[in-house]
Amino acid sequence: MLFYRFKSWYRLQAKKSPFIYVGLPFLSSVLLVWSCLIPISQVKFNRRDEQVKSLSRDAELDIIKRRRKVDVNEEYYRILLDQLNLQNEEYENKRVKRLKGEPTWEGNSSDKE
């Protein structure tokens, strides 16, 4: 019963001053979550920076040597070919009976068959 009283009181107050009872709690919750997530995401970036800094000079040279040349046209056609291959794997030809009176390529009518 107490909950319903509070609910009706809150709804009435929210109609009178919506920013204080709706906007302010929303904005404060957004700011609270934002302030909590910044340190968490910063830890992730710090770890990544440490990994990059710890990469030795030999490993850097090895990565540079193994890098392949990238051509935009070649990549476009490679991706296009991959997509076509995926579509063709799912494709299956099925023969469908013709409707009566439907013409064929030879010019014969299927009525005669």
UniProtKB/Swiss-Prot annotation:
Q: Keywords, A to Z?
A: Membrane, Mitochondrion, Mitochondrion inner membrane, Transit peptide, Transmembrane, Transmembrane helix
Kindly list the cysteine pairs connected by disulfide bridges. none
Q: Which residues cross the membrane?
A: 20-40
One biological process GO term for this chain? mitochondrial cytochrome c oxidase assembly
Any one Pfam family match given in the protein's UniProt record, by short name: COX16
Sorted alphabetically, the Gene Ontology cellular component annotations on this record are: mitochondrial inner membrane; mitochondrion
Tagged with keyword Nucleotide-binding: no
Q: For this protein, what is any one GO molecular function term?
A: copper chaperone activity
> What does it do?
Required for the assembly of the mitochondrial respiratory chain complex IV (CIV), also known as cytochrome c oxidase. May participate in merging the COX1 and COX2 assembly lines.
What is the designated name of this protein?
A: Cytochrome c oxidase assembly protein cox16, mitochondrial
Biological source species = Schizosaccharomyces pombe (strain 972 / ATCC 24843) (Fission yeast)
